[in-house]
């Protein structure tokens, strides 16, 4: 999983997935991409005849997959975050504690998911609005 530049990740040196793949190919020269899918996640996989398993990469920063992202996060404070890059969220806790109906909750979920950004902003530090650490967000 590629380090995302949020929270403490902003101060850490990132290593590109391409550099990691190059290092892995020094050990397993036949490491090649596969079309294999596991679940509905964003990982893409590599295989080698010298390995029993697969090596998966989730490289959201270097190789944006935002348009196909099917992930949202629910924080411990009840905030539904459609994207890790932005501070935007839907306050489900207040909605639920206020006695919302199932239909109202479903509608809030639909709106949040429908409004997921088409791309993240991690390549422009000034555009990143999320200031919480991953541990505060739920990652």
Give the role of each language-model region.
Residues 55-57, 82-83:
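Short capping micro-motif at the N-terminus of alpha-helices
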């Amino acid at each position: 999983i590629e380090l995302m530049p949020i929270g403490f990740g902003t101060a850490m040196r990132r290593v590109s997935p391409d550099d990691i793949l190059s290092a892995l190919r020094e050990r397993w020269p036949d490491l090649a991409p596969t079309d294999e899918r596991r679940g509905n996640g964003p990982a893409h996989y590599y295989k080698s005849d010298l390995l029993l398993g697969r090596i998966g990469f989730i490289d959201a920063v270097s190789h944006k997959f935002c348009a196909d992202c099917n992930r949202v996060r629910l924080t411990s404070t009840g905030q539904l975050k459609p994207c890790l890059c932005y501070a935007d969220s839907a306050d489900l806790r207040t909605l639920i504690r206020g006695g919302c109906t199932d239909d109202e909750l479903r509608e809030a979920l639909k709106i949040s998911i429908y409004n997921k950004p088409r791309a993240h902003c991690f390549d422009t530090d000034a555009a990143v609005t999320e200031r919480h650490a991953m541990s505060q967000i739920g990652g």
